[in-house]
């Protein structure tokens, strides 16, 4: 059984055409992208010539940004239309990105069968809260990571503040996101993420919150993880 939620996939299929519109449904992701890219570069000590896997890449906003920094990027997702958009946009930008429609669990099986090289950097951003079994995603990512590689997750804390900001505020009041984009019950507390990553034999190297400034339209990072947050992991042996 594939680790996916058909209703979640349908949401993003419907929004595919607006993926690269900086003022469309994915405006918050476009605004967030410079901040998360900078975080990834800092934690990974740069991306030039590093082999990167972007899990849940969607229309390729982060994949392209990392490729432009010199990374060798593979993007995987289970949606159809967003991947088509991603391939077309990368071609228009003159970027070579390997986009595949496949789950990370299936990708791992394929890589294992081919004895393929593992990845220096793996990103799984804004995805764990959209799948039935986050632990399975985490374990597969860990298995695909090089011994000295760096793994990134971002998600949303299950708090009243997060609901007020991400669901009520962003979806219903400010209408920054389509209604129904997020399901509060699927939000993930940092303690839960750390428990799952510990089970997967990963250690957290850094965790921080990211926050939106309505006046500037930009995101910034701090230590407040009560709403949106992202974290860096490595193998426990590192």
Curated annotation (Swiss-Prot):
InterPro entries: SAM-dependent_MTases_sf, UbiG_MeTrfase. CDD domains: AdoMet_MTases (cd02440). It catalyses: a 3-demethylubiquinol + S-adenosyl-L-methionine = a ubiquinol + S-adenosyl-L-homocysteine + H(+); a 3-(all-trans-polyprenyl)benzene-1,2-diol + S-adenosyl-L-methionine = a 2-methoxy-6-(all-trans-polyprenyl)phenol + S-adenosyl-L-homocysteine + H(+). Its EC number is 2.1.1.222, 2.1.1.64. It holds the Pfam family Methyltransf_23. Keywords: Methyltransferase, S-adenosyl-L-methionine, Transferase, Ubiquinone biosynthesis. S-adenosyl-L-methionine binds at residues 36, 56, 77, 125. Pathway: Cofactor biosynthesis; ubiquinone biosynthesis. GO terms for molecular function: 2-polyprenyl-6-hydroxyphenol methylase activity; 3-demethylubiquinol 3-O-methyltransferase activity; polyprenyldihydroxybenzoate methyltransferase activity. One of its GO terms (biological process) is methylation. PANTHER family: METHYLTRANSFERASE, UBIQUINONE BIOSYNTHESIS O-METHYLTRANSFERASE, MITOCHONDRIAL. Belongs to the methyltransferase superfamily. UbiG/COQ3 family. O-methyltransferase that catalyzes the 2 O-methylation steps in the ubiquinone biosynthetic pathway. This is Ubiquinone biosynthesis O-methyltransferase. It comes from Histophilus somni (strain 2336).
């Amino acid at each position: 059984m594939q680790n996916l939620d058909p209703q979640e996939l349908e949401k993003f299929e419907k929004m595919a055409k607006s993926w690269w519109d900086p003022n469309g449904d994915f405006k918050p992701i476009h605004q967030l992208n410079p901040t998360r890219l900078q975080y990834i570069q800092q934690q990974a000590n740069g991306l030039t010539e590093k082999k990167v896997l972007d899990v849940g890449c969607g229309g390729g906003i982060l994949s392209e940004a990392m490729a432009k920094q010199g990374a060798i990027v593979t993007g995987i997702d289970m949606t159809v239309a967003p991947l088509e958009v991603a391939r077309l946009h990368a071609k228009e930008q003159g970027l070579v990105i390997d986009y595949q429609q496949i789950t990370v669990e299936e990708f791992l099986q394929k890589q294992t069968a081919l004895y393929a090289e593992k990845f220096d950097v793996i990103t799984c951003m804004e995805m764990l809260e959209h799948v039935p079994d986050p632990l399975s995603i985490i374990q597969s990512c860990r298995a695909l990571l090089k011994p000295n590689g760096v793994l990134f997750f971002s998600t949303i804390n299950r708090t009243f503040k997060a609901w007020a900001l991400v669901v009520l505020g962003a979806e219903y009041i400010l209408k920054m996101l389509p209604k129904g984009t997020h399901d509060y019950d699927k939000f993930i507390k940092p303690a839960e993420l750390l428990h799952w990553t510990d089970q997967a034999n990963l250690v957290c190297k850094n965790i921080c919150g990211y926050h939106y400034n309505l006046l500037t339209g930009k995101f910034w990072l701090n230590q407040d993880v009560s709403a949106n947050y992202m974290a860096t992991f490595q193998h426990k042996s590192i």
